[in-house]
């Protein structure tokens, strides 16, 4: 992950203090505080999003490292979404329908939605899962085993146990290069937001010139 992307983005935000002036009281809300929070947390996690920090071993230490890797991606992605909503003034999120990153899906879903499943099973709440694991329209309850490498086809895996006696466990595999690609694609979206900031700043300055 290129640390220069967030550095350039922060420089663009802080240029001439115009983003501060525009967003510290926008439609009755202090969006400047959200912008600062998002930038700060991207700074915190970006260097941890590196496959050198994870291991394919089947032990507790590797499980914690993968958990940290996934949660750092999640924090970065949530921050980018917040920035997108503010600067584009929309409730939508980027890459909503993209499906090209995760090539080993257990069920069909967008990359954004499938990452939520990965986050839940490997990090956020593995003992309380409710998702479309078998591809059916109706969600089902599952409970993840410990995560580890070497017991399925992926770099890292969990077994998903069902609460139904007649249903077998499923394997959910993840591949570190796919997770990194997911992260890099969304992190690079900061460049698109930067372009929007430049346009907004020009509009703001032109509006004052016309007064």
Cite the ranges covered by each PLM segment.
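Generic structural signal for short, solvent-exposed loop/turn connectors between secondary structure elements
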Residues: 1-2, 54-57, 85, 109-110
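Short, contiguous, well-structured surface segments enriched in hydrophobic/aromatic residues
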Residues: 24-53, 63-92
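Extended aliphatic helical segments
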Residues: 13, 19, 44-46, 54, ...
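Short linear interaction motifs
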Residues: 54-60, 91, 95-104
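Acidic, Ser/Thr/Gly/Pro-rich intrinsically disordered interaction regions
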Residues: 1-37, 98-211
């Amino acid at each position: 992950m290129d640390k220069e992307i967030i550095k350039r983005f922060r420089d663009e935000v802080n240029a001439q203090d115009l983003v501060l002036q525009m967003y510290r009281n926008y439609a009755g809300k202090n969006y400047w505080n959200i912008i600062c929070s998002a930038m700060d947390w991207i700074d915190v996690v970006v260097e941890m999003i590196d496959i050198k920090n994870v291991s394919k071993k089947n032990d507790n230490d590797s499980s914690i490292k993968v958990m940290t890797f996934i949660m750092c991606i999640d924090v970065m992605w949530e921050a980018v979404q917040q920035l997108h909503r503010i600067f584009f003034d929309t409730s939508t999120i980027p890459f909503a329908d993209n499906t090209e990153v995760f090539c080993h899906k257990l069920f069909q879903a967008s990359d954004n939605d499938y990452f939520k499943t990965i986050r839940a099973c490997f990090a956020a709440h593995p003992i309380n899962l409710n998702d479309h694991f078998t591809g059916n329209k109706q969600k089902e309850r599952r409970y993840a085993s410990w995560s580890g490498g070497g017991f399925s086809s992926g770099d890292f895996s969990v077994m998903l146990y069902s609460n139904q006696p007649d249903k077998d466990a499923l394997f959910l595999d993840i591949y570190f290069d796919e997770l990194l690609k997911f992260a890099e694609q969304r992190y690079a979206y900061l460049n698109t937001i930067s372009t929007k900031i430049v346009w907004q700043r020009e509009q703001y300055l032109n509006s004052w010139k016309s007064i």
